[in-house]
Amino acid sequence: MITTSVTEAAECLQQGQVLAYPTEAVWGLGCDPFNEQAFQKILELKQRPIEKGVILLAGHISQVEHLLTSLPQTTQQEIIDCWTNHQPSERATTWLLPADQHIPSWIKGEHPLVAVRVTTHPLCVALCNAFHGFIVSTSANPSGQEPAHSLQDACQYFGSQLNYLNGDLGQSQQPSRIINALTGEVIRP
């Protein structure tokens, strides 16, 4: 199914299906992070090892606040400021945060932290809000291939194996940078 309806796309996620959708820079694959079967389908489609982990994408700070509480107040504020002051033309930032007991182990892979990004991309914000929480976000491509930059690219990779939320990419030219919130280390510049 190809849709432009955020409501239909959120229903696909709620039904345990995989969805391709445009993000800030490239097309992503998403699912309900708490649905292991849907998550395994993404790994199968991407031919990606589970050890690598994936990003959780949220539409609002309130969807991830519980993951910030163990951090020092100054670090919490830095992360919130980074997400809330993000400009559409700027590169997005994903933070590695301490995972709480509610984050499934398959999301983190072999890592002790969970990768989280609060997006300002309008379609992604609407999707996360319609889904009422964060979703899995990993680039829409088989491992070793270039990420999809259009609906056509995503369809060429995956055909009818999943659903598509059609819309515009954001203005960023690069995937998000990744920063470890505990150490400040930039993992992906």
From Swiss-Prot:
Domain of life, source organism: Bacteria
Keywords (A to Z) from UniProt: ATP-binding, Cytoplasm, Nucleotide-binding, Nucleotidyltransferase, Transferase, tRNA processing
Gene Ontology terms: biological process: regulation of translational fidelity; tRNA threonylcarbamoyladenosine modification
InterPro entries reported in the protein's UniProt record: DHBP_synth_RibB-like_a/b_dom, Sua5-like_dom, TC-AMP_synthase, TC-AMP_synthase_SUA5
Catalysed reactions, semicolon-separated: L-threonine + hydrogencarbonate + ATP = L-threonylcarbamoyladenylate + diphosphate + H2O
EC number(s) reported in the record: 2.7.7.87
One Pfam family, short name: Sua5_yciO_yrdC
Record-given protein name: Threonylcarbamoyl-AMP synthase
Cellular component aspect of the GO annotation: cytoplasm
Family: Belongs to the SUA5 family. TsaC subfamily.
HAMAP family linked to this entry: TsaC
Ranges for domain YrdC-like: 3-189
Role played: Required for the formation of a threonylcarbamoyl group on adenosine at position 37 (t(6)A37) in tRNAs that read codons beginning with adenine. Catalyzes the conversion of L-threonine, HCO(3)(-)/CO(2) and ATP to give threonylcarbamoyl-AMP (TC-AMP) as the acyladenylate intermediate, with the release of diphosphate.
Broad class of the protein's primary localization: cytoplasm
Organism per entry: Acinetobacter baumannii (strain ATCC 17978 / DSM 105126 / CIP 53.77 / LMG 1025 / NCDC KC755 / 5377)
Subcellular location: Cytoplasm
PROSITE patterns registered for this protein in UniProt: YRDC (PS51163)
Single Gene Ontology MF annotation: double-stranded RNA binding
